[in-house]
Amino acid sequence: MADMLGLMQRLEFAVSRLERLSSGLHEPPGGCGEVNSLSRGIVAPSVEAFDKLINSMVAEFLKNSRVLAGDVETHAEMVHGAFQAQRAFLLMVSQHQQPQENEVAVLLKPISEKIQEIQTFRERNRGSDMFNHLSAVSESIAALGWIAVSPKPGPYVKEMNDAATFYTNRVLRDYKHSDLRHVDWVRSYLKIWSELQAYIKEHHTTGLTWSKTGPVASTASAFSILSSGPGLPPPPPPPPPPGPPPPFENEGGKEEPSPSRSALFAQLNQGEAITKGLRHVTDDKKIYKNPSLRAQGQIRSPTKTRTPSPTSSKSNSPQKHAPVLELEGKKWRVEYQEDRNDLVISETELKQVAYIFKCDKSTLQIKGKVNSITVDNCKKFGLVFDHVVGIVEVINSKDIQIQVMGRVPTISINKTEGCHLYLSKDALDCEIVSAKSSEMNVLVPQGDDYREFPIPEQFKTIWDGSKLITEPAEIMA
């Protein structure tokens, strides 16, 4: 009897287990069974490798950013969110076949929104003391767009990494002798992109590798992967398509159908019988059979002239910003100045810096001695200063004139069209570093006047058997 009871218990256990397995097999795609399988870690090797990158390199960067706190930490959290969005996309890629190109663009939208959020954060915090940190991230986060690059996504990531080093070098220059936490931050951030290049080389060498089995990816099939985390209940399935519209009935509280709308639905309900109302057109009224009608030319239907709304001109005009000339902590902010030639900063200290942004047709004079000056996104702007102990930088600008009254060790010119440097006798030993710029001239004093020397824009590189030798290509007489 005991053996019989034990056998019955084992049979009941087996039946219940089979029922559970059967219900799991019949679950619709995106159901709880799929989420449970994901929570058990059944993922493709490429996704596992990407998880390792997030859990090691991105986590290390996030830890170092939390040490610096403030805007850097907030920015790093956004970066972590962008990598999580890319991880969800790669998971979908490993389980689905490649869809049409327009569908791929829709599926990439969560990642592109994360990238845009990171770049917008930098633009909204230009006055931040950690602006170089934010710029390093903002200028390189587009590397996550490698998933849309073929056949060589790896070099694309390297190109974005190079864009970051322009700003990380600034961070290293400012903190390498004073605060090593920033040095660790730079190393951990750049390590992310070098590891991502290695990941791409191993798993997606010539472009994104989609699954060759499974359903074709779509917004419906991938919704649960892109928007739900492992272990969470999936979103409900989309509602069924709506049925035919209800008939218009004269009920209390409902809008009365207009006669024209009722007539329209009455005609639609005729079906093919609607063509019975068409009358026959005789040959003398057909243009292609009647030369006299052709001679009259085409009859053009009257077109309605569209008057622009009063708000259209406002929406197209660029947004005006209030001009700024103020001291924030140790930073002088000079922003959005237009047609001002009387700007002066006279009360300066050695530890102060000046940041000049989006000034047009203006001139600024800085008296005394400051640490550094940055001219960013300015046009037809003149700068006169006494002494700078660090560096003067000009970036993303056009038609800039700088006059040095005292001394400056380094002047950097990047992505600028037109920059004239008037040096004093005490500043003749300064270093001038330029990149991606044109129409640069240095004017040195000679008696009571200046002599102009152009900075080379064209270079010649040769191989001498052991190394590359680069020198200016002198083509001027």
UniProtKB/Swiss-Prot annotation:
SMART domains: CARP
One of the protein's GO biological processes: presynaptic actin cytoskeleton organization
Biased composition (Low complexity): 300-318
Gene Ontology molecular function: any one: adenylate cyclase binding
Domain C-CAP/cofactor C-like: 318-455
Subcellular location: Cell membrane
UniProt keyword Membrane, yes or no: yes
Modified residues (N-acetylalanine): A2
Keyword field: Acetylation, Cell membrane, Membrane, Phosphoprotein
This protein's GO CC annotations: cytoplasm; glutamatergic synapse; plasma membrane; postsynapse; postsynaptic density
Tissue: Found at relatively high levels in testes, at moderate levels in brain, heart and skeletal muscle, at lower levels in lung, skin, kidney and small intestine, and is undetectable in liver or spleen.
InterPro entries for this protein: Adenylate_cyclase-assoc_CAP, Adenylate_cyclase-assoc_CAP_C, C-CAP_CF_C-like, CAP/MinC_C, CAP_C_sf, CAP_CS_C, CAP_CS_N, CAP_N
Pfam families per UniProt: CAP_C, CAP_N
Function: Involved in the regulation of actin polymerization.
Similarity remark: Belongs to the CAP family.
Name of the featured protein: Adenylyl cyclase-associated protein 2
Organism the protein comes from: Rattus norvegicus
